[in-house]
């Protein structure tokens, strides 16, 4: 375990940079905060590259740290600066962004398609609701907010790690899915019906 005592530490700067979409895209990683989210990620098949814990969390919480993941103990005030939330729980993880290239939908499964969702909290809530309702995945158009936004991940309340979420699904792809046997059912806020 390494200790971080300064916000000018390169690891601290790196973690903070991942709150920005361009850094997440550049490095292919994102952060998650909080005991539940980190525990859910550890219990999933996601690749966690590092865990950061505050001094007080390390001293007071009984948390089982995996031996195969880099662990950093961070001075409390420095940890606060690394986090996206105003009242962090004292633990965060850096997670690799999954490769989506191999996604092929299954006609035996059900998916929710989101078009142009621009609020990260709403997207996280949709992911959480889809998980609770028994859907097998969530498909996102290019017009949707960044899937790996800290607020999206946080709003999903751990469902982020239970659901298959695929980005960049165009209308053309939806048409292909329909032609291959999927039934498409749509809903919207316009108040009109359409075939």
PLM-predicted stretches and their roles:
Residues 60-67, 103-106:
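Short loop/helix-cap segments at secondary-structure boundaries that form the rim of catalytic
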Residues 66-96:
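Glycine/small-residue-rich loop that forms an oxyanion/phosphate-binding "nest" at active or ligand-binding sites
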Residues 1-59, 144-145:
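Boundary-proximal intrinsically disordered activation/regulatory segments immediately upstream
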């Amino acid at each position: 375990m390494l200790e971080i005592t300064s916000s000018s530490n390169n690891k601290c700067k790196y973690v903070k940079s991942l709150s920005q979409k361009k850094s997440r895209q550049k490095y292919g990683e994102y952060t998650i905060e909080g005991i539940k989210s980190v525990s859910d990620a550890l219990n999933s098949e996601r690749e966690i590259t590092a865990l950061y814990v505050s001094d007080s969390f390390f001293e007071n919480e009984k948390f089982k740290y995996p031996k195969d993941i880099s662990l950093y103990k961070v001075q409390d005030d420095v940890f606060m600066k690394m986090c996206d939330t105003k009242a962090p729980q004292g633990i965060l993880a850096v997670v690799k962004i999954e490769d989506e290239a191999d996604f092929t939908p299954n006609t035996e499964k059900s998916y929710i398609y989101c078009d142009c969702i621009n609020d990260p909290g709403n997207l996280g809530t949709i992911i959480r609701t889809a998980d609770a309702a028994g859907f097998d995945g969530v498909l996102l158009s290019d017009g949707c907010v960044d899937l790996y936004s800290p607020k999206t991940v946080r709003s999903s309340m751990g469902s982020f790690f239970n659901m298959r979420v695929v980005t960049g699904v165009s209308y053309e792809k939806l048409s292909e899915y329909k032609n291959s046997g999927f039934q498409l059912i749509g809903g919207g806020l316009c108040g009109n019906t359409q075939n």
